[in-house]
């Protein structure tokens, strides 16, 4: 079958990798994400991945306690490299070739990012894991995911979250929260819906990249959406889709 998208970037938060632990990496969660990526590859989809570092370190936590935000963000970038290496290991266990490209140079551990190299690896059928955020402080890994998606010409940016789409409020706290099947980038920004930071959403909008919000914890969910089904919210500016969703 023909997948809905041919080239995608998958963004997963560092917190998602913790599973039910309070810190660090739950290998079973990383293995599940790896299996979902392998499923996408079986459809002929080219996959890039960005993982946050919040399960290990968050730069804003340093700043909130009076520390230097720049140093804190640099520490957070290192955490994303750890998570990226963990995912590469899980992919290798199931025979999937993956390469980690980092925005910060650390040649003993991984290659440095370049758009040309990323595209070459994806054309060769390898998973490309983008580590180190954007390489600059004050930018989130959500912004890094949107940036990499634009750089490689991705058809969509998949945002794996704790819930199965975009809601008007946190459904885990508000029983009256309304789930959206389809919503625009502008509405997400205007209503302050906390799926990604504003810079990431604006970058996706400017480059006509739809954001697919789904549950990272639903095994097989990634592939189901690529096959045209699944549970998700599509964030884009397609007027026809908006009209259909509101009908």
UniProtKB/Swiss-Prot annotation:
Main localization, broad class: cytoplasm
Top-level EC class: transferase
Keyword Transcription: no
Molecular function as annotated in GO: ATP binding; UMP kinase activity
Region (Involved in allosteric activation by GTP): 19-24
Residues binding ATP, per UniProt: 11-14, 54, 58, 161-162, 167, 170
This protein's UniProt keywords: Allosteric enzyme, ATP-binding, Cytoplasm, Kinase, Nucleotide-binding, Pyrimidine biosynthesis, Transferase
A GO-annotated cellular component: cytosol
Activity regulation info: Allosterically activated by GTP. Inhibited by UTP.
UniProt GO BP: 'de novo' CTP biosynthetic process; UDP biosynthetic process
SUPFAM superfamilies xrefs: Carbamate kinase-like (SSF53633)
Pathways involved: Pyrimidine metabolism; CTP biosynthesis via de novo pathway; UDP from UMP (UMPK route): step 1/1
E.C. designation(s): 2.7.4.22
Residues binding UMP, per UniProt: 53, 73, 134-141
Subcellular location per the Swiss-Prot or TrEMBL entry: Cytoplasm
Reactions mediated catalytically: UMP + ATP = UDP + ADP
InterPro entries: AceGlu_kinase-like_sf, Asp/Glu/Uridylate_kinase, Uridylate_kinase, Uridylate_kinase_bac
Function: Catalyzes the reversible phosphorylation of UMP to UDP.
Subunit structure: Homohexamer.
Family: Belongs to the UMP kinase family.
Protein name as it appears in the record: Uridylate kinase
């Amino acid at each position: 079958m023909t997948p809905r998208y041919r080239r995608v970037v998958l963004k997963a938060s560092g917190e998602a990798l913790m599973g039910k632990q309070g810190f660090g990496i739950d290998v079973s969660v990383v293995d599940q994400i790896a299996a979902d990526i392998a499923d996408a590859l079986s459809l002929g989809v080219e996959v890039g991945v960005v993982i946050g570092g919040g399960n290990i370190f968050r730069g804003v936590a340093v700043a909130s306690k009076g520390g230097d935000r720049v140093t804190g963000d640099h520490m957070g970038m290192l955490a994303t490299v750890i998570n990226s290496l963990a995912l590469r290991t899980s992919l290798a266990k199931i025979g999937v070739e993956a390469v980690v490209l980092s925005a910060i140079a650390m040649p003993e551990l991984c290659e440095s990012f370049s758009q040309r190299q990323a595209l070459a690896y994806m054309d060769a059928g390898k998973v490309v894991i983008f580590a180190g955020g954007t390489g600059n402080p004050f930018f989130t890994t959500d912004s890094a995911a949107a940036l990499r998606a634009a750089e490689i010409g991705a058809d969509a940016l998949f945002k794996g979250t704790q819930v199965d789409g975009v809601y008007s409020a946190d459904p885990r706290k508000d029983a009256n929260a309304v789930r959206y099947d389809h919503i625009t980038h502008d509405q997400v920004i205007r209503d302050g819906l906390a799926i990604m930071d504003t810079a990431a959403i604006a970058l996706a909008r400017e480059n006509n990249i739809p954001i697919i919000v789904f549950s990272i914890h639903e095994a097989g969910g990634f592939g189901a959406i690529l096959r045209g089904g699944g549970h998700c919210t599509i964030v884009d500016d397609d007027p026809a889709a908006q009209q259909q969703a509101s009908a």
